[in-house]
Amino acid sequence: PYGVKYIGIGNEEVLFNGDRADEYDHYVERFNLLHDAIKGKDPSVKLISTAWWRADSPSMERTFRALDGKADYWDYHPWADQLASGREVEAELRRMRELFLRWNPSTTMKCVIFEENGNRHDMQRVLGHVTLQNAVRRMGDFVLTSCAANALQPYRQNDNGWDQGQVFFTPSQVWGMPPYYAQQMAAAHHRPLTVGCGVEGADGVLDVTATRSREAGSVVLHI
């Protein structure tokens, strides 16, 4: 009755004890049980694997093969604090896509980024976030969405270890931090279709993508 379209099974599973094959196998077992229960009620719901992505782990192929056709997406949580975050994440996304297609050339599994993480909320984090957004745009429909953490942070009362709130608040005030405004700009000027573009003479210092509306009535540059 709530119109839920996507459900992630868990969050950052098989992370805290390292790369353990038995924990990946246990995750697959639990995923399958929940898959059958959810799909039995609503076959249209898209399910998301949240097993921690480790591209070099032998458990990745085994987990992928066990969930291929059941998980629509694999949740990937990159670090987004650095100026090079966009380039690094784009390389990892391309590797993920390459591995998926190597393991099954006909797979429909794709990626979703439900958390871009970091420990800052300043202009450097803005640049990490927006270059990561450009990386996602260049990946086309392989990546469903990318979400910057965290949404809220109580001013001088934060006790969860993360210092990356987009919106700070007190009992009487609410204000956005720089990443909030970058996200606001991206949402306000979203266009669904990517346009090919290139940069010359910038010595690699500019990261640029372009998108347009379906009717081709407007083009947005992300620089």
Task: Please state what every model-predicted region is.
Residues Y2-V4, G69-A71, S106, W162, ...:
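Short, solvent-exposed loop/turn segments at the edges of secondary structure
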